[in-house]
Amino acid sequence: MTETAHAAGASPEAIRSHYDVGNDFYRLWLDETMTYSSAMWRDEDDTAPLAEAQRRKIDWHLRHAGADRATSLLDIGCGWGGMLRAAVATRAPGAPPL
């Protein structure tokens, strides 16, 4: 391992430490979707709760990806599946099955 990679926290020990933390820890500070990335607030004055801002972000991504009519979806290491569950739940009537 290079010094740069180690300094960036990419050591095997750091990775194990991150992934060995149980879900209970993440439930303390994530919303019910368990989305582990920034939410989407409208502006600096937006006081929407985290769950609403996360849903806004998920909806934005699904809309821009055209997921409502997609013929397949691939979820690789995207947390706890919140994005995929939202995509399946918001399928357009008559959309092809996944």
Label the model's feature ranges.
Residues 1-29:
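N-terminal auxiliary segments of SAM/dcSAM-dependent transferases
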Residues 62-69, 88-91:
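Structural motif corresponding to the C-terminal cap of alpha-helices
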Residues 69-77:
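Conserved class I S-adenosyl-L-methionine
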Residues 80-93:
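Conserved SAM-binding loop of SAM-dependent methyltransferases across substrates and taxa
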